[in-house]
Every structure is written in structure tokens, then in C-alpha cells.
Amino acid sequence: MAALRRALIILAHSEKTSFNYAMKEAAVEALQRKGWEVAVSDLYAMKFDPIISRKDITGALKDPENFQYPAESALAYKESRLSPDIVTEQKKVEEADLLIFQFPLQWFGVPAILKGWFERVFTGGFAYTYAAMYDKGPFQNKKAVLSITTGGSESMYSLKGIHGDMNIILWPIQSGTLHFCGFQVLEPQLTYGIGHTPPDVRTEILAGWKKRLENIWDETPLYFAPSSLFDLNFQAGFLLKKEIEDEQKNNKYGLSVGHHLGKPIPTDNQIKARK
């Protein structure tokens, strides 16, 4: 019998009548049907505080006269002095094999409440260290997927669309947040123009999401340039190794959205996994 898998769904939408809430409900149903244990962090329902502050640390601060949140929160994590709400969320993350982030795209990024969740929960020492980041990060054995709704149509987020390439929009979240902490990032579930989508199509989208979730653990993650391609020290500047740079000179495309090397970006690098 396969080992029990655990999923954590982080929902960032205020309304239970929203399509985002319906996507969350569909995910819970589909995963539980396949034997997953599912936890949900409904950030609005929880009244989650997205603002980083001194209140996140219990006990004496290391340097109260020159408060620096990253250093103080990392030390507080190490010494078990983080506030209870942060500890609760970190425990959920620790226990999960798969994280699903369900949210509407707002101003080309995550909603403020979810941004605050990342800033408060993904503390130094817990979610990253500079000695262990990206594919060597603390969460390298976990998987994550973004399930996003947009107001604009798919064409608006295309290469010729007025909003620009969706791959560019996804890079800071998928690489700069999730993969930076080690997650294997799966193809995003993108639901475009949901406000203009008729009920029958919405039903089809929910059914397709449920179907995908049946085997989501077996999916191939998105490609990111491995950390082994870089000189990982401050003296070298964490730059691409010279021999790798030389190897890439004759390639038509760059390595990824962020590591394009001045060349065309690989098609759908942040939307489709390499086959």
C-alpha cells in the first residue's frame, strides 16, 4: 500500500461564492478521494495577519535598537520563539508533501494576504538558507503548484498580448519564492477570464482540475537551471560557471525565463514541463 500523502491548500480569496473557493473545494474532494490527507489554510477566514512586525517574535530581540526582520525571525525560528500563528502554519508546511496555492492574480502577483503569508511563514532557517537554496533548499522533497484565476483572457497574457507573457509574470513566484525554498514546482493551473466564463465551462474546468489532481504527484516538475551550474559563493558572485556559459553560447535559447543569457526565452518555460 502506498504511503499516505499529505496536501496543504492555501486559499487567498475572501468569498465562499468565488470560483477560487470552488477550485479549493474541488481539490479537497479529488485528493481525499485518492487517499490524500488534506489541510486547508483559508487565509481570509482565518483572519491571517499579513504584516511582518516585532510581534512575530516572542521574548527578547537580539537588536531592538536596529530591528531587522529577516535576522530576528531566523533567530526566533532557531530558538522556537516565533509567534503561535506562524508556528502553526510552519507545522502545516512541514507535514505536507504537496502545497497548492489557490488565488486570483492581482496586480500581476499574489494577493497581499498571501504575500504576507510567504513573508511571515517562510522564515530564514525554516524555508531557506544561503548555504542551501533552490534545488538544494529545505523543501526539495516537496512539490508545489499554483492554481490561478485571472480577469483577463488567455490572449491578453500571450507573447503578443497587452499584459505580456504569462511566463514572465510567473517567474518571481515560481522561481523566486517556491523554487528558491527548494520546492519542485509543477505546471501552474491557469484559469483565464473567469469572470466571463459561462457556468457550463466552469463546470468543465472544475472537472478537469479534479482529473489532473488524481495523478498530480507523478507529474514532471518545471525546469529550472540547477544550482550546480553556478559558483555558489559570495567571492564568485553566485554567477554561472564560465564553462557553462561557454557551453550555452551556441544554443538558440537561454536556460530559462530568468537565465535567458540575452537569448530568446524557452517557450512556456514557466507553464509547461520539459518532455
From Swiss-Prot:
Names of required cofactors: FAD
Keywords from the named record: Cytoplasm, FAD, Flavoprotein, Isopeptide bond, NAD, NADP, Oxidoreductase, Phosphoprotein, Ubl conjugation
A molecular function (GO) term: NADPH dehydrogenase (quinone) activity
Record field: catalytic activity: a quinone + NADH + H(+) = a quinol + NAD(+); a quinone + NADPH + H(+) = a quinol + NADP(+); ubiquinone-10 + NADH + H(+) = ubiquinol-10 + NAD(+); menadione + NADH + H(+) = menadiol + NAD(+)
Pfam families named among the record's database cross-references: Flavodoxin_2
Modified residues (Phosphoserine): 83
Record-level GO cellular component terms: cytosol
Chain positions covered by the region annotation Important for apoenzyme conformational stability: 226-275
GO BP field: cellular response to oxidative stress; negative regulation of ferroptosis; negative regulation of protein catabolic process; removal of superoxide radicals; ubiquinone metabolic process; vitamin E metabolic process; vitamin K metabolic process
Cross-link (Glycyl lysine isopeptide (Lys-Gly) (interchain with G-Cter in SUMO2)): 252
Gene3D superfamilies, per database record: 3.40.50.360
Binding site for FAD: 13, 19-20, 68, 105-108, 149-152, 157, 202
Keyword Flavoprotein among UniProt keywords: yes
Domain of life of the native organism: Eukaryota
Subcellular location as annotated: Cytoplasm, Cytosol
Record has Transmembrane as a keyword: no
Main subcellular location of this protein, as a coarse class: cytoplasm
Amino acids binding substrate: 127-129
Catalytic activity, EC: 1.6.5.2
Subunit structure: Homodimer. Interacts with PDLIM4 isoform 2; this interaction stabilizes PDLIM4 isoform 2 in response to oxidative stress and protects it from ubiquitin-independent degradation by the core 20S proteasome. Interacts with TP73 (via SAM domain); this interaction is NADH-dependent, stabilizes TP73 in response to oxidative stress and protects it from ubiquitin-independent degradation by the 20S proteasome. Interacts with TP53; this interaction is NADH-dependent, stabilizes TP53 in response to oxidative stress and protects it from ubiquitin-independent degradation by the 20S proteasome.
Its biological purpose: Flavin-containing quinone reductase that catalyzes two-electron reduction of quinones to hydroquinones using either NADH or NADPH as electron donors. In a ping-pong kinetic mechanism, the electrons are sequentially transferred from NAD(P)H to flavin cofactor and then from reduced flavin to the quinone, bypassing the formation of semiquinone and reactive oxygen species. Regulates cellular redox state primarily through quinone detoxification. Reduces components of plasma membrane redox system such as coenzyme Q and vitamin quinones, producing antioxidant hydroquinone forms.
Similarity-based family: Belongs to the NAD(P)H dehydrogenase (quinone) family.
Identification of the protein by name: NAD(P)H dehydrogenase [quinone] 1
Annotated gene: NQO1
